Amino acid sequence: MLGIDIGSNTLRAVFMDEYFNKLKSEEFIIATAKNMQNGLISNEAIQRLFNALKILSEKYNLSQAKAVATAAFRNAKNTEDIFIKIEKEFQLKIQVIDAKTEAKLSILGMQERLKTLKLFRKNLSYCDLGGASCEISNDYFSKSYDFGIISFYERMNFKAIKPNAYVNFFKKHPKNLAYIKDKKLKIHFSSYPVHFKQIFFEAFNVIKEAKKNLKGKFFVLNSGVPTTLCAYKQNIKYKDYLEESVNGKILKRKDFFNFALKIWNLEQEKAKIYLGENRKKYLIAGSMILFALFDKQKLIVIDDGVREGVCIAHFKNIKF
């Protein structure tokens, strides 16, 4: 069976058998949440979506697939018109799912992979940071927050701020930064690029409510930010990405800050090779969000998510 997750940043598809073996997987960057200030999915994003579906239609019978769409399509005014055209051209029916169902399917996919890796345990918490929303869940709690890697970055109001006397002082005497214990203040006085620091501080603002509800020592992360980070640490190029290379990897909070800083300084051509086309700024934004969100939790990376959950729900006869 082919399960399709049409997200706010990527379209992900998986061909799975009834034993939950993944026979083939596909991923396309469609960035549907990009330039949605007027409440409409842009013509450029629609074209990227249709291009992705055309490629899939040449490999699979889309009339037999199960497809779901998430946050950007929940919010867009032109979702119905887009889906009518898709059904007419590809015979594919798409179901817009609510945040609770999205979290349920994402967890279903993650848990099955954790069981395969013998990493599943009780009292795990889950975080799925998408393009336009972030779902945080555990056995007793599930909530969707109105920030994602694209929507967060698109809302940034970058300002041209000149370094003040303190920044100039610490730039000349960087060792003195060690005496500042407050981490945010240390960043404020650092010589990091101005826009980098603005993303850093805004990330702490947007996650305030989510952080209050954050419970648990072990979190499973399954979105493109942690998976790309893990691949990048292993020097794996975007085109050579393999799910097996990231599944079960453990990350620490500081990994996200370090990743954001490294790719900030990565030239565009290399960024395209290692991160994928036009993903650099959104990965920086997402890394800052996850750095701000977590503290000392153990973070487990799993590639599986909604697309796998769609297939597993079908085979287990779970209604959604």
Features from the language model and the residues they span:
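Helical "lid/coupling" subdomains associated with nucleotide-phosphate turnover
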Residues: 31-55, 73-76, 80-123, 138-320
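Short N-terminal binding/cap micro-motifs at the start of the first secondary-structure element
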Residues: 10-14, 35
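A structural signal for short, well-ordered beta-strand segments
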Residues: 24-30
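Beta-strand initiation motifs
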Residues: 20-24, 143
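Ser/Thr-glycine-rich phosphate-binding loops at phosphate-binding pockets of nucleotides
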Residues: 8-10, 110, 130-136, 224
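Short glycine-aspartate micro-motif
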Residues: 1-5, 124-128
